[in-house]
Amino acid sequence: MYNSADVTWTLVAAFLVFFMQAGFALCEAGLTRAKNTGNILMKNMMDFCIGTPCYWLVGFGIMFAGSGALIGGFDPFIQGSYDFGTLPVWVYAVFQTVFCATAATIVSGSMAERTKFSAYCCYSAAISLIVYPISGHWIWGGGWLAQLGFHDFAGSTAVHFVGGVTACLGAWMLGPRIGKYSKDGKARAIPGHNLTAMALGVFILWFCWFGFNGGSTVSMTGDDTMVSAGLICFNTNLAAALATVAALIVCWVRYGKPDVSLTFNGALAGLVAITAGCDVVDPFGAAVIGIVAGVLCIFSVEFFDNIAKIDDPVGAVSVHCMNGLWGTLAVGLFATDGGLFYGGGFAKLGIQLLGVVSVAAWVLVTMTIIFTIIKKTIGLRVSEKEELDGLDIHEHGLASAYAGFAINDATYAELDVNENTDLGEDDIAKASPEKVAAAVKVTQEAPLPAELDSGMHKVSIIVQLAKFESLKQALNKIGVTGMTVTQVMGCGIQKGSGEKYRGAEVDATLLPKVKVEVVVSKIPVEKIIDTATKALYTGHIGDGKIFVYNVAKVVKVRTGEQDYAALQDVE
């Protein structure tokens, strides 16, 4: 007999969990660069839209169509007979579908800004088809871990640890983003472009987590269930709040100022950690779980950034993998019935540890195979040029996710806002053509028809003030002796200002500049470009910009000479 209160409660919770996709999309987009925003949004849309039919096809059956120790059963399109108590099968199916999508979307953040969109679609399908359903069966479908007494109420392991382990493996196999590490291995900051979007995403996720955890009772019938739902929601909120405070304090002590993005990461860490045991711990246990989660999150980000050298743009590994692990083990410590700190001994803690180790092994083996197949076939990572230009334009044909907004300096040279500048190679002889092009951008006006081409060109070079002398000497060596030099605006953050982002030093992106202009006819333009590029290159985005224009006519005012004759004593 179905119960309307239980059905309504579960459906509303499912709707809230679905809305977590919006939170993940905003959080990830805000913590990455503007040139990849469209790609981030597409990934968060498509992992849900691909995962939904995949889970309907076989995932749900693998998870719930039977009580085998390792796997449920094969039930394509959910055609079998199921008993979910007071819930119709389709209510339970939609609730589980949105949980499956959450596991898949976690991976997006750690592999952001350098993953092929086609590859992302493929491994999102694999997660929903087989990886998540099998480990989910072990935990929630009557599998061997459930039979041992493993407890994961709403998914610290089943959802977040699965997604977090996959995220860690994927980020490691991809390698870091260009410019993330200097030649000596020091981590560099690559700031996100919109902390407002990130903050809104975290608030949405926090709000939806009440459905994620509270809705996992899948019932609102009876006094005991209602009391449990209230405790679950209270514990969820308390752990998140204290995790945020703990993260803030650690940041303040370690960096001298409270880091915005890491503090918000701390909130998510607390939410992930309390998810496993929110129904079996008291508020005091929830408080400790949250505090540890916030501290763990900060040190975990530092570890993966500086020691493991795994580039995780949004902190997904620290939030979901490490705190999914901590939250699951915390059940064995703080469960009021059987927890180590409540007189229960080590038995429950041992079962919890066995569970996370087993799930980690399953995910690592299967996802290593899947990532390797993708890498050997369609490829896992985009090219250097695509990464430097941004995935929006190359993967989606999107010039900008912010149409109508552009930021230029006084020389009309485009600036990448909050852009890490280090390309990782300061020797131009060893740098790839893509890195050279990113450091010294060249823009040439389309050539004129032969009958209109005077053979003369104006070359305008935007150069950092410190590089002007070396540029002048290099141009003199190839015969350029006449030039116009103009100082232009472009002063910004200077070295030594102490600015940090997620604990890493932020590069100065704007420095004093000069504009050097020369008009040439007998010296080939290509030679000017090559000489200037070699003189300016230091291995950083923004080393210089070169603009080449066609010149229709030149007149020397003093003598009246025109065109080629007017240039003879100035080249």
Which role fits each region the language model picked out?
Residues 1-447:
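Glycine- and aromatic-enriched membrane alpha-helices
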Residues 394-400, 414-571:
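Positively charged, small/polar-rich N-terminal and surface patches that mediate targeting and assembly
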